[in-house]
From Swiss-Prot:
Record-given protein name: Polyketide transferase grgF
Database matches in Pfam families: Abhydrolase_1
Active site: C115, D240, H269
Signal peptide: none
SUPFAM superfamilies in the cross-refs: alpha/beta-Hydrolases
Recorded GO MF terms: transferase activity
Superkingdom of origin organism: Eukaryota
The protein's role, per its UniProt record: Polyketide transferase; part of the gene cluster that mediates the biosynthesis of gregatin A, a fungal polyketide featuring an alkylated furanone core. The PKS grgA synthesizes C11 and C4 polyketide chains in the presence and absence of the trans-enoyl reductase grgB, respectively. The polyketide transferase grgF is then responsible for the fusion of the two carbon chains to produce the furanone skeleton of gregatin A. GrgF first undergoes a conformational change to an open form, and the active site Cys-115 is acylated by the C11 chain.
Assigned keywords, A-Z: Transferase
Organism of this sequence: Penicillium sp
Subunit field text: Homodimer.
GO biological process, one term: monocarboxylic acid biosynthetic process
Coiled coil: none
Length: 294
């Protein structure tokens, strides 16, 4: 992708629960379709998505990219406390705010999410029919983790709740350990955090214990059937280990028409951003054009 000369501005909006979420607006050159983008698990808006937002901006789509609650520039305490249901609700508030922008055709607002953001995007699209289309890229489907870690996580969560009632600070765990494992037993690439540091992406390597308590009660498979009749596209790397390919395909099977699947041959969770990303994004643009008529 080439460097963009189009503008980017700082924006903020208020959620129903009184928080201010802050992000970036990538305005297209004229009024038309719009895209709200959601980053990965415990990730700020800076991670990977700005270049993709610029690409869509250059192709006539106004994009909104913001830090989720408790991350980066956005409000929310405790910090790094991730709640899928709450993030989906905040996407509803983002739509409410975004549709008032003079550059945005309120009938052509789509959602786009990466990894955990893909999960949240699917959930928000299931319940908010103001959304015209949804794209989930390498979505994290099962966030409950290794069953052997369930009881230790719950015990930590109960200890944390009791301690906080006594005035203690929230309990945190490393987001990613040196070997690439995360607290619930799932495995990420060991080089992920060092790579983000080299790229200058400000990811805090910590996450609240309560994040994993909340994840144990969240199952996207219970809601994806309600996305229809909103058109949805799933973009699945063939060799995804971080968000297993088979989980993504199983989720796609649970979804109803209209739906489209784009399998990225030979690609892992994030390495699709290197190489021929243009063709991948062009297929997503074609999906949006066909279903949002622009």
């Amino acid at each position: 992708m080439t460097a963009s000369t189009l503008p980017r501005s700082d924006v903020e909006f208020t959620t129903l629960d009184g928080l201010t979420l802050r992000g970036w607006l990538f305005p297209a050159s004229q009024r038309g379709p719009a895209l709200i983008m959601s980053p990965g698990f415990n990730m700020p808006k800076d991670a990977i998505l700005p270049d993709i937002a610029k690409w869509f901006q250059e192709h006539g789509i106004t994009c909104l990219l913001y830090d989720p609650r408790g991350i980066g520039a956005s409000d929310g305490e405790p910090r790094n406390d991730i709640d899928a249901r709450q993030q989906a609700e905040h996407l509803h508030d983002a739509v409410t705010w975004f549709k008032e922008n003079p550059l945005v055709n309120e009938k052509q607002i789509a959602l786009w999410g990466l990894c955990f953001g893909g999960n949240v995007t699917l959930a928000a699209a299931a319940f908010d029919k103001r959304v015209a289309a949804a794209i989930a890229v390498a979505p994290l489907i099962d966030s409950t983790g290794n069953p052997e870690r369930r009881q230790p996580i719950l015990e930590l969560a109960m200890h944390d709740r009791a301690s906080r009632l006594d005035g203690e600070e929230p309990m945190y765990l490393p987001y990613v350990n040196e070997d690439g494992s995360i607290p619930n037993g799932l495995q990420l690439a060991a080089e992920m955090m060092p790579a983000l540091e080299r790229l200058g992406i400000p990811v805090e390597n910590r996450i609240s214990v309560q994040t994993y308590y909340k994840s144990l009660s969240w199952n996207i498979l219970n809601v994806v059937q309600y996305i229809s009749p909103t058109p949805a596209m799933m973009v699945t790397p063939e060799l995804d280990v971080s968000c297993p390919t088979e989980d993504q395909l199983n989720c796609f099977e649970h979804m109803k028409e209209p739906k489209e699947l784009d399998i990225l041959k030979g690609k892992g969770h994030l390495d699709w951003v290197f190489g021929d990303v243009e063709s991948i994004l062009n297929r997503q643009l074609d999906f949006l054009k066909r279903h949002m008529a622009f």
